[in-house]
Curated annotation (Swiss-Prot):
Subunit and interaction comment: Part of the 30S ribosomal subunit. Forms a tight complex with proteins S10 and S14.
BP-aspect Gene Ontology terms: translation
GO cellular component: cytosolic small ribosomal subunit
A GO term for molecular function: mRNA binding
Keywords, in A-Z order: Ribonucleoprotein, Ribosomal protein, RNA-binding, rRNA-binding
Domain KH type-2, first and last residues per copy: 39-111
Domain of life: Bacteria
Highest classification ranks of the organism: Bacteria, Bacillati, Mycoplasmatota, Mycoplasmoidales, Metamycoplasmataceae
Keyword RNA-binding: yes
Matches recorded under Gene3D superfamilies: 3.30.300.20, Ribosomal protein S3, C-terminal domain
Protein name: Small ribosomal subunit protein uS3
Summary of the function given for this chain in its UniProt record: Binds the lower part of the 30S subunit head. Binds mRNA in the 70S ribosome, positioning it for translation.
Similarity comment text for this entry: Belongs to the universal ribosomal protein uS3 family.
Organism (species): Mycoplasmopsis pulmonis (strain UAB CTIP)
One Pfam assignment: Ribosomal_S3_C
Gene coding for it: rpsC
């Protein structure tokens, strides 16, 4: 029987770079891993506000933490003269309960948010929460992504669609989507829409073509 695997985890270390890049001794590993989880939780709350598509974490030997935040609203996230990013850094230190922690947040602009699976999934979630029909919400995201240059896109929504009693899954696929080909550059993300009928899960796969030179993206 065929088993499904997360397309991101399937490609990490092969054609996709890990989101966390650091080394730690055995005694520190669990502490750093928990810190990473908390950093992701912190930015999870800001995804829709700043259109955050990806968060990368790096550490050096001196214990400094470098957080790379990929955002489609770079200007809004930085704020006037970088004041907002200073506030976010202080809030993150407080969230981690380490006010003296050396943290540097770098905001990287997302030029084409229509090709980012996370942002597409969140957009579908927002549309569903605003009572837009699930078919129209998916087709709108697919059309925008293909128009922006995606080679293929696949979407799926699951739950009490349109408020019916029995939950089901419906989705669409357009263009090429070679999930078994490791050199195929596939971006995958999940999101949840909180509707009056309950939670609806959203999955989005975006194919950006093949990586032929063996380089990691």
């Amino acid at each position: 029987m065929g088993q499904k695997v997360n397309p991101n985890g399937f490609r990490y270390g092969i054609t996709k770079q890990h989101n966390a890049i650091w080394y730690a001794e055995k005694k520190d590993f669990s502490k750093f891993l928990l810190e990473d989880q908390k950093i992701h939780q912190f930015f999870e709350k800001l995804v829709r506000q700043y259109l955050i598509g990806k968060v990368e974490i790096k550490r050096d030997q001196k214990g400094r933490v470098f957080v790379g935040v990929h955002s489609a609203k770079r200007g809004a996230m930085l704020g006037q003269e970088g004041k907002n990013i200073q506030t976010l850094t202080a809030s993150l230190q407080k969230f981690l309960r380490q006010k003296n922690k050396d943290i540097k947040i770098d905001v990287i602009n997302i030029d084409q948010p229509e090709l980012n699976a996370r942002l597409l999934a969140e957009q579908i979630a927002v549309d569903l929460e605003n009572r837009k029909p699930f078919r129209i919400a998916q087709k709108f995201a697919i059309r925008n992504s293909l128009k922006a240059g995606a080679k293929g896109i696949k979407t799926a929504v699951s739950g009490r669609l349109n408020g019916v009693d029995m939950a089901r899954t419906e989705g669409y696929t357009e263009g090429e989507m070679k999930l078994h080909t490791l050199r195929q550059k596939v971006d995958y993300a999940q999101a949840t829409a909180r509707t009056t009928y309950g939670a609806i899960g959203i999955k989005v796969w975006v194919s950006l073509g093949e990586i032929l030179d063996g380089g990691k993206q």
